[in-house]
Every structure is written in C-alpha cells, then in structure tokens.
Amino acid sequence: IQYNSKATGGGCNKGHMLGSAERTSSTETNRQVFYYTNIAPQLSSGFNTGGGGWNLLEDYIDTQVVKDTLYEVVGCYFETFTDGYGNAVNPKTISFGGRNDVSMPTMFYYAVLRTKKGNSGKSVKDCKADELQCVAFVRAHTNSLKGQEPSSKEMMSIADLERLTGFSYFAGVPNAPKDSFKASDWGL
C-alpha cells in the first residue's frame, strides 16, 4: 500500500488496530504496527485519542491479561452496525481531496481468548472448553463514546461476531467456548 500524505484530516486519523505499546519487545516488532495492514481510519476526537472510546477499550483489554496470555484479534466492520444501546452507525466515506474516498468503519472489535485461571501450564489448543474463556468486545465507531468505559452491552459471543463479520476466530483452538460468555468473567 502506497503512502498518501493526504490521508489525515477530515476529523479522522490513521488508527492502529494493534497499538504501538503492545509490541515493544524489539524495534522491528514495534515497526510492524505501523504497516498499513494494521491501520484503519478512526475518528480523532472522542474515539482514538486519550479518553476516547477506542482508547478506553484498548486500556481495558490490557487489564484482562492472565499469566498464560491473552490472545487478541482486532478488526473493524464496514456495514450498518447497531450497538448494544440501540444506536445505529451507518456506512460513510471521507474525502481527502483525491480521486478515491476512504470508507469509514462503523464498528471496531476485539475478539479475545484466555485460560480461566492463567496457570494451566498448557497451550490453549490443548485446553478443555471449561478451562477457557472467550468473548468479543465491540464499539460503535462514534465520537459519542468519549469518557465512556466499556460495558457489558458492548460484548457478544465469538459465535455472534463470526456471524456478523463472516470470519472465523480462534480456529486453531477447537474447544474455544465461542457460543457463550459471562460478562462477570471479564469484570463487567
């Protein structure tokens, strides 16, 4: 993907799907989060800045790590999306004055998987369903989330996220409990 110096403005910025702070083990791994394959247009004010909706969800996800690990799949959605509060976000495009408009996502999500206790001592692919937890956190792409911490209304099962997006998550973990979750397991 070719760099476009005009790809900022219009009230949005180049938002990282996986944040730079998540990859600090080496300069090379940190450099990889700046590839365009890890970038999506995000609203600046109220969503992708300090105290913004996405920023607060990123911070919350960081608190969900257990000793074993936390597997994260981060993505965005471009069709009409209705959040857990009943608010609909419709698809739109942003123009930067060039020939091509940029489609704006209507929703961003984290699909996360972890062991329940954090000390199983084995790979998640070898765990039984009752040893694992997984859930999707979904946030509407809107500036109205500034200062709003994630809530249980923004959670859905991995199976529901798969139906919505058409993608399969945690395919290498055959016992992942994709059909259900408890908000209380995730502190909500």
List the predicted regions and their residue ranges.
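Domain-level detector of nuclease and nuclease-like folds
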Residues: 1-188
